[in-house]
Amino acid sequence: EYRDGNKKIAPVVAPRKGGVTIKREGYTTRRYAPPLVAPKRGLTIDDLNKRGFGEDLYSQITPEQREAQVLGNDLTELSTMIDGREEYMAASAMLNSGYVLKQYADDYGEKYEEFELFFYDGESDDSKYTPSGHWTDVDYDIIGDLRAMIRLLTSKGLPAEDLVFSPDVTDDIIKNKAIKELLDIRNVNIGTIAPIELPDGASRIGVINIDGHDINLISYDEQYEDENGELQYFMGEGNVVLTAPASGRSLYGAVSQLEQSDGRFHTYMANRVPKYTADAEAETLSLIHIPSPRDVEES
């Protein structure tokens, strides 16, 4: 559900006239079908009879004990992969107010269908700002662009605190003449440890004040491996996003699945839903994590 903010002020009323009725603002309800994220890994008796990673050469671990270790490691690895997919979706939502995902039915990287989900109405995204020049020019008015981006947020009653950008943009910002003058180098304490907690891949290179707004300059260089085995930046190249903490949220859909234990369907409300299936004839065990993430980065 969404409700547009406003900048209305209360009316002035003539004496002895009571009050002036102000209509309540309406809201919009949208229904989304979230995408399915389901990495799967098989486990066979051959896997359990082999020495595991990090085990002693003459290990005394039984296949039964090794099964618990392997499944635990698989759960951790698959969950980390899901974290990466969620981060990819969040970054795409920040950059494009939505995302286009590839849905695979068989082998990863082969045939797929596209899944599209966007969080704006109409043909274009009105929250996207296009500069009039190139930030690579040290004399270009980056401050003017940031001022315009700030107003896009504050005009809707939203805060502007963090400028998150691709690693290749870092040099453009640092070398800009106007930015150099605004960077607060007076607060650099030589020999003093003053850590700032930031997610992996995020580096705060400074703080600038624009019209009373303290803007954190954050370079984000975290990467992921795509379907072709190539490393890509979550933020892509040449991208800048002005946002604020807690400006988005993650929503998860319910997962209904047939359980092998009782042969019945069960529905789960959780961000991680494991599914175990066993094939007695083929002696295999499959593990599937099935979350339904929907990352909405609100502008």
Predicted regions and their residues:
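Short N-terminal edge-element motif at the start of the domain
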Residues: 128-148
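Long, contiguous amphipathic alpha-helices that act as assembly "spine/axial" helices in icosahedral shell
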Residues: 35-121, 145-171, 278-287
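Short, surface-exposed beta-strand/loop "edge" segments at domain boundaries and coil↔beta transitions
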Residues: 6-8, 248-254, 294
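Conserved small/polar residues in nucleotide/adenosyl-binding loops
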Residues: 288-293
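Assembly/oligomerization interface modules of large self-assembling protein complexes
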Residues: 1-56
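Extended oligomerization regions of viral-like shell subunits
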Residues: 156-252
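C-terminal structured domain segments
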Residues: 231-287
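Extended, polar beta-sheet/loop recognition surfaces of beta-rich domains
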Residues: 296-298
